[in-house]
Amino acid sequence: MPSFPAPLASRLPAVGTTIFTVMSRLAQECGAINLSQGFPDFNAEDVLFERVAHWMRTGHNQYAPMAGCLALRAAIAAKVETLYGTAYDEESEITVTAGATQALFTAVTACVHPGDEVIVFEPVYDSYVPAIELAGGTPVRLQLSAPDYRPDWEAVAAAITPRTRMIMINTPHNPTATIWTRADLDRLAALTRGTGIIVVADEVYEHIVFDGASHASCAAHPELAARSFVVSSFGKTYHITGWKVGYVLAPRELMAEFRKVHQFNVFTVNTPVQLALADYMADAGRHTGLAAFYQAKRNYFRAALANSRFDLLPAHGTYFQLARYERISALGDTSFCEHLTRKVGVAAIPVSAFFADGRDERVIRFCFAKNETTLAAACERLNAI
């Protein structure tokens, strides 16, 4: 194919291929066990596939309504009200999205104007900042530090200016596996009270919280719910990340702006999958039982590495485990992850990739959303270092 005949000014000149793609590709090339990218290596229940097939075979294969199938929006509304006590209107306050990343991107581009500032907490999921920059906004980065990765509320207060348009939060947090508390949400509410600041709450791991803790959702905090986009993911909840289906909750004024953008970047989402998910959600145990399911995997993984030379950080939620490796190597985290993949046969993610300045605290991220046989094989290799 001939090359493009003129210079091209990139909208994202500093952005390359994501670290997740890089490490997964390297894992495949090396035949390594992939504990890098955050997806399961096991299937969802057959009944979910059967419901998709049912809706396909009975003729539900055309466009769904722009906001999503009403049956699914109603099921989401019922779940949210049961869990968090807030009634969202399925007609005007819930939208089904093509995954959580699309929901985050759409929320940012719908509300951020050139010159606006958006506060993010590093280490930060890699889609946030590009969305802000494409909207013409300026990311304001506040750093969370190992080992506890707690927000510094004095720093948050100092970072808020008249130009602050939005604050993006993520709880349970990827990559650190920390969770925010109700007290954290109260502090956030106090800092944004009387302002026009919008909160985008990335809560895709809402059902994966351990040790008897409860997820502190912005949807359950009336003051924050009134100014927040709350984003969740069916992929994370039902082990179907490749289906790319999520949803967003917001008060009708915010949702009206969201849908203006949503209708032009995806319009709508796969119809039979939406209807199948509406059916599948009827059994609440499928999401309320997720914490125990993943806590067992977390416990297995941590126990299997207890005598290794890795120092495991606390994991309070998500399906990720951070580990220090200073007792093993003096390499930087990216080089160490490459070494692990090529020489040890286990792929992980360097946490420096989640910091704009590449801050390297010699911490890497493993994903334990895997079959026990996969985790056992990976831990055998990691224990041999």
PLM regions and their residue ranges:
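Helix C-cap/helix->beta junction micro-motif
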Residues: 30, 135, 194-195, 308, ...
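PLP-dependent enzyme catalytic core of the Aspartate aminotransferase-like
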Residues: 78, 339-348, 354-385
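Conserved PLP-anchoring active-site segment centered on the Schiff-base-forming lysine
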Residues: 110-132
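N-terminal small-domain helix-loop-helix segment of the aminotransferase-like
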Residues: 2-4, 9-99, 106, 280-282
